């Protein structure tokens, strides 16, 4: 298995994998258009051509980025793929000069194992103003904001 930059021919598999978790309310859904528009920010773990994990890097400000759409195929869960994808995103973020990597998540225990700590969502104004204001869950957000300092 290896982590690669996503390419356009990966989008259908990426969409299908994200949809499984979006339908469960675990991650936000992503449209095909959104995936194509952010293709350069997506990383995939492949095994024999099959995408078994995906993660996105979304820059929010001068030193802040978010890990988005982190999902691993259920058949491969528990094998460290999620952690490898988080570390890949962190590595790429450092190359861009990013110092703080955040996630809004329901998976607090997983992200804690990846060196993230819980913070107030309101301590991340870049995220709140960019995305949260237009989210239907804004006033009743039940996701946990977590941060990892990477530089």
What is the role of each PLM region?
Residues 16-29:
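Helix-loop element at the rim of GNAT/NAT acetyltransferase active sites that forms part
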Residues 105-131:
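Conserved active-site alpha-helix within GNAT-family acetyltransferase domains
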Residues 2-14:
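A short beta-loop-alpha structural element at the N-terminal edge
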Residues 29-41, 46-47, 53-64, 68-70:
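A conserved beta-strand-loop-helix scaffold within acyl/acetyltransferase catalytic domains
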């Amino acid at each position: 298995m290896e982590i690669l930059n996503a390419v356009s021919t990966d989008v259908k598999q990426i969409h299908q994998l994200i949809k499984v978790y979006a339908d469960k309310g675990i991650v936000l859904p992503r449209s095909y258009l959104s995936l194509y528009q952010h293709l350069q920010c997506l990383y995939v773990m492949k095994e024999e051509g099959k995408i078994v994990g995906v993660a996105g890097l979304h820059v929010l400000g001068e030193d802040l980025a978010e890990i988005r759409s982190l999902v691993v195929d259920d058949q491969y869960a528990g094998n460290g793929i999620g952690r490898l994808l988080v570390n890949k995103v962190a590595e790429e973020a450092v190359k861009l000069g990013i110092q703080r990597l955040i996630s809004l998540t329901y998976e607090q225990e997983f992200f804690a194992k990846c060196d993230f700590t819980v913070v107030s969502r309101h301590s991340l104004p870049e995220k709140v103003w960019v995305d949260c204001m237009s989210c239907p869950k804004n006033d009743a957000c039940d996701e946990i904001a977590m941060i990892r300092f990477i530089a």
